[in-house]
Amino acid sequence: MKNSESLKEFKKLNSDQITEKIGQLRKDLFELRFKQATRQLNETHKFKIIKKQVAQLLTLSKTQSASKTTSD
Protein backbone atom coordinates (compact mmCIF):
# COMPACT_ATOMS: atom_id res chain seq x y z
CA MET A 1 0.00 0.00 0.00
CA LYS A 2 1.43 3.35 -0.99
CA ASN A 3 1.58 6.17 1.52
CA SER A 4 -0.81 8.40 -0.43
CA GLU A 5 -3.32 5.57 -0.64
CA SER A 6 -3.13 4.88 3.07
CA LEU A 7 -3.59 8.57 3.86
CA LYS A 8 -6.67 8.70 1.64
CA GLU A 9 -8.06 5.65 3.43
CA PHE A 10 -7.27 7.17 6.83
CA LYS A 11 -9.18 10.34 5.95
CA LYS A 12 -12.32 8.24 5.39
CA LEU A 13 -12.27 6.96 8.99
CA ASN A 14 -14.25 8.51 11.83
CA SER A 15 -12.67 9.37 15.17
CA ASP A 16 -13.52 6.03 16.83
CA GLN A 17 -12.03 4.08 13.93
CA ILE A 18 -8.92 6.26 14.00
CA THR A 19 -8.45 5.59 17.72
CA GLU A 20 -8.88 1.86 17.14
CA LYS A 21 -6.40 1.89 14.25
CA ILE A 22 -3.84 3.80 16.32
CA GLY A 23 -4.13 1.19 19.06
CA GLN A 24 -3.67 -1.63 16.58
CA LEU A 25 -0.61 -0.01 14.99
CA ARG A 26 0.96 0.63 18.39
CA LYS A 27 0.40 -3.03 19.27
CA ASP A 28 2.07 -4.02 15.98
CA LEU A 29 4.99 -1.71 16.77
CA PHE A 30 5.37 -3.32 20.20
CA GLU A 31 5.42 -6.77 18.61
CA LEU A 32 8.06 -5.64 16.11
CA ARG A 33 10.24 -4.34 18.94
CA PHE A 34 9.86 -7.65 20.75
CA LYS A 35 10.85 -9.58 17.62
CA GLN A 36 13.83 -7.31 17.10
CA ALA A 37 14.98 -7.86 20.67
CA THR A 38 14.82 -11.62 20.18
CA ARG A 39 16.53 -11.33 16.79
CA GLN A 40 13.56 -12.78 14.88
CA LEU A 41 12.84 -9.67 12.82
CA ASN A 42 13.89 -9.63 9.17
CA GLU A 43 11.79 -6.69 7.96
CA THR A 44 13.17 -3.71 9.86
CA HIS A 45 11.66 -1.25 7.37
CA LYS A 46 8.25 -1.85 8.93
CA PHE A 47 9.25 0.32 11.93
CA LYS A 48 9.40 3.41 9.74
CA ILE A 49 6.15 2.60 7.96
CA ILE A 50 4.15 1.97 11.13
CA LYS A 51 5.56 5.02 12.93
CA LYS A 52 4.62 7.19 9.97
CA GLN A 53 1.09 5.77 9.88
CA VAL A 54 0.64 6.40 13.61
CA ALA A 55 1.80 10.00 13.14
CA GLN A 56 -0.61 10.49 10.23
CA LEU A 57 -3.51 9.10 12.24
CA LEU A 58 -2.67 11.24 15.26
CA THR A 59 -2.54 14.32 13.03
CA LEU A 60 -5.92 13.45 11.52
CA SER A 61 -7.35 12.89 14.98
CA LYS A 62 -6.13 16.29 16.17
CA THR A 63 -7.46 18.09 13.10
CA GLN A 64 -10.84 16.37 13.39
CA SER A 65 -11.15 17.27 17.06
CA ALA A 66 -10.06 20.84 16.33
CA SER A 67 -12.62 21.21 13.55
CA LYS A 68 -15.36 19.85 15.83
CA THR A 69 -14.54 22.36 18.56
CA THR A 70 -14.47 25.30 16.16
CA SER A 71 -17.77 24.31 14.54
CA ASP A 72 -19.54 23.93 17.91
From Swiss-Prot:
InterPro entries in UniProt: Ribosomal_protein_uL29, Ribosomal_uL29, Ribosomal_uL29_sf
GO BP annotations, alphabetical order: translation
Parts forming coiled coils: none
Signal peptide: none
Protein name per the record: Large ribosomal subunit protein uL29
Top-level lineage group: Bacteria
One Gene Ontology term, aspect cellular component: cytosolic large ribosomal subunit
Molecular function per GO: structural constituent of ribosome
Keyword Ribonucleoprotein: yes
PANTHER family, per the entry: 60S RIBOSOMAL PROTEIN L35/50S RIBOSOMAL PROTEIN L29 (PTHR10916), LARGE RIBOSOMAL SUBUNIT PROTEIN UL29C (PTHR10916:SF0)
Keywords assigned: Ribonucleoprotein, Ribosomal protein
Annotated family: Belongs to the universal ribosomal protein uL29 family.
